[in-house]
């Protein structure tokens, strides 16, 4: 009978221990490390946390807790809602979630104490001469606490917004600079591969630039003592004077004026192209031509009469 009761008690203890297991409670604690240093108690610690003998539990987990030994925390950690406990404790499972993810960290704090010796007692034989500074280091204090986990977000830039690696350094060939009403001229110093100077308003989409002076055709000016005819007849193709003489069979009783063709002044030619002014016909040259024609006619008549 006693053996039956002992077996039943052992089974009850085992079942109670399994009921407090994190796997049976559906608790996701993460990586746990088993520790057997605490007076023969088998407890679990979160991964990365070490424990001293002074911090070990003295008994098993109470009702409603599991065998995961926790340092104090003030935010939900590993599914534990015992946030107000300032000592090591067993995990009290819950379905709560922290506002931000946290992880355990171990910090070590050391204190340094500085002492200054001004004088020594008479009994001190090896007293240093003058002030002496002695540094005393207090043993370090280790604290385990949760810290928030900062997630890193990578900022991506669309490929369509990327800029070209290099900018073309070459420019188009030269473009003749033109001005309204003038003959297109060649810019001084222009050549293949040079940047053209574009006159404002000559083509859309070009940048204005100052163009050098364009050489124009010479403009003929009218002399002050000559008149400008209304029209100018084109010069004939034949430049040799042609004299028309009367028939030798008939002898006129009275000298008649022969028909004389008036030629244009010598040296006149095709007008210049481009920006030019129509040159006038020289009145004096026409009169000289008429006089020459009259003298030639009179000479012919005199030869016939002789």
UniProtKB/Swiss-Prot annotation:
- Name the keywords, alphabetized: Cell membrane, Cell wall, Glycoprotein, GPI-anchor, Lipoprotein, Membrane, Repeat, Secreted, Signal
- Which positions make up the signal peptide? 1-16
Q: Where are the residues of the annotated region Disordered?
A: 224-257
Top-level taxon = Eukaryota
Q: Where is the lipid attached (GPI-anchor amidated alanine)?
A: 283
Ranges: sequence repeats? 166-173, 174-181, 182-189
State the membrane topology: Lipid-anchor; GPI-anchor
Low complexity: bias regions: 239-257
- Compartment list: Secreted, Cell wall; Cell membrane
Induction description: Expression is induced in bean root exudates and water.
Provide the residues annotated with a glycan attachment (glycosylation): 225, 275
Q: Which GO terms describe its cellular component?
A: extracellular region; plasma membrane; side of membrane
Its family? Belongs to the RBT5 family.
Described by its record, this protein's role is as follows: Cell surface adhesion protein that plays a key role in virulence by allowing adherence to plant roots surface in order to colonize the roots.
How does the record comment on the protein's domains?
The tandem repeats might be heavily glycosylated to produce a rigid elongated structure that holds the adhesive N-terminal domain at the cell surface.
Q: What is this protein called?
A: Adhesion cell surface protein MAD2
Which species expresses this protein natively? Answer: Metarhizium anisopliae
Lineage of the source organism?
Answer: Eukaryota, Fungi, Dikarya, Ascomycota, Pezizomycotina
